[in-house]
Amino acid sequence: LIVWYKKAPKLKPFLSYLMVLIVFCELTLNMNVTGIPSTSGRKGYYEATKAYDQLNDITKKDADSQNVKYYRTESAVHTTRNDGARFNYNSISTFSSVLSANIQDYFDSMGLQTSYNACSYYGHTPLTASLFSIKYEYSTGEPSLPNNVSLLNSASYNLESGGNSTVYAYEYNNTLPLGFLINSSSIAKMNSEAGDPFTMQNNFVTSAVNGGQMIFHRLKTDGTNSITAQYNLEENDTANKSGTKVYDIYFYCETSAETLTATVSNGSIQDKSFVSSSVTTSTSKTFDSANQNYICHLGNVPEGATISISASDNTAISAMYAYAFDETAWEYDYNLLNANPYQVTSFSDTKIEGTLTTDKGNLLYTSIPYDKGWSVY
């Protein structure tokens, strides 16, 4: 068409019309093939939004009853990284071309999922969820960390394809405020002893407050593909863990694989079910987007069980770290971290006000990312 357009001036009007028609037809075909089937219809979108609005009202009333002015909410499974914006709740997951590299570095160090221009709630632990003031989690099924939440409420909506779906609102048992005091030497210790994400989190709780205890205890592994539900404590881990019968297992793999699959032998994964009011039992669990290297939560596994980690397409796993979470130590550390909270009295998109009582020599740790234009007074 372009050749004819250049060589036949008399046909230019007709050829211009023909090119516009071809482009229009192609756009229409693309929309029908790739656009319409992959997105929610208007009715389904509207119904889902109403359900989330109901839960937003419920969680706000619950937070108000506890005099909590600021908190964050997350989804156990994302539709997009910007679900918070879509459903009108404050979250830490975001997709943005102007995302700060420093925020990504922090997420990476703590084992949270990141990509080139996005960061995510995936990879969270009870500590990191609490550090980001995540008080509620929405899920269309079970919560991501069943040992650490309680069921608050639910809302149902009609699906466009027929039937209905239910969204559950879970409340974390321990949520730190937007800011709290830590020892002034804590940041330097974390940076000087940086390692895998579990080491980073242990370093934080043991250095941020006097008397802090390690919340992750190392397990036996072959370093790449196999985990045994038995302790292999580090030299500086003095916890007495004898008699442990069930291990709440987390692991982290360095790999370029798209998918990781954890398979349990000599036992099974047994987690509390809030939806069916029973215990869910399985022998395998799959983790997607594993090439973005984040902490994977396996769940409760009995002592002595063996967990095999396999990567998709026979991709190599260059390193693997596996730890069991210590709920008792976390309860103890949480109370220490929450001893000197920043009490938010009011907030908006441009201003946060609150009160804090402090002695000299402490740092105010907040989950407010630094950005030019913000000031403290």
Q: What kind of feature is each model-predicted range?
A:
Residues 1-3:
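Membrane-embedded alpha-helical segments of integral membrane proteins
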Residues 16-362, 367-374:
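Soluble catalytic regions of membrane-associated enzymes that act on cell-envelope
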Residues 5-20:
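Membrane-interfacial entry segments at the cytosolic side of transmembrane helices
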